[in-house]
Amino acid sequence: MSRLRIFDDHTPDTPFFVSKEQAQITAELHKIGITFERWEATQAIEPGATAEQVMAAYRTDIDRLIATHGFKTVDVISIAPDNAKREEMRAKFLEEHFHKEDEVRFFVAGSGLFTVHSGNKVYEIECVKNDLIAIPDGTLHWFDMGAAPYFVAIRFFTEPDGWVGHFTGTDIAQRFPRYIPEGCQSAH
């Protein structure tokens, strides 16, 4: 289930707002310019589906976003717990950074934790299957896929080079808890 926790940026252990309600999550994130919505597949997706089959199941929503935002590239990324580069991939996203384009991700399966630093607040957004999140360009954030990552996501890019992060060099991401998906017992 999707979850939003909001913290003061100096109290990483004590959220002052917690919700698993779609409408509340959407409303709170809208206040800081973030789009959060749910999509449903128009056809079944079988295990082992190709990127083309995954995108076909969400074609209407994908086309709407491309038309609205002018995305030039759309792809599918799939990360499993047995990925040999999982630690390297996780570390790449764990520090606070921003992009010069919107970061838009749709979770087809699995989960991940986007954390946004806006003003003096930190918004921790757990995204799960059927969640779309769109973080505006210039927004400070980090992403934690967990120690044993599992997700399939559709990614949208306006830059042909794809993901380019501009890191702030602050330690704020290190002060906040790491992502432990529901059902896991300990952090790694």
UniProtKB/Swiss-Prot annotation:
Site (Important to generate the dianion): R105
Alphabetical list of InterPro entries matching this protein: ARD, ARD_bac, RmlC-like_jellyroll, RmlC_Cupin_sf
Cofactors demanded by this protein: Fe(2+); Ni(2+)
First-tier enzyme category under EC: oxidoreductase
Keyword annotations: Amino-acid biosynthesis, Dioxygenase, Iron, Metal-binding, Methionine biosynthesis, Nickel, Oxidoreductase
Function field: Catalyzes 2 different reactions between oxygen and the acireductone 1,2-dihydroxy-3-keto-5-methylthiopentene (DHK-MTPene) depending upon the metal bound in the active site. Fe-containing acireductone dioxygenase (Fe-ARD) produces formate and 2-keto-4-methylthiobutyrate (KMTB), the alpha-ketoacid precursor of methionine in the methionine recycle pathway. Ni-containing acireductone dioxygenase (Ni-ARD) produces methylthiopropionate, carbon monoxide and formate, and does not lie on the methionine recycle pathway.
Subunit architecture: Monomer.
Protein name per Swiss-Prot or TrEMBL: Acireductone dioxygenase
Organism listed in the record: Xylella fastidiosa (strain Temecula1 / ATCC 700964)
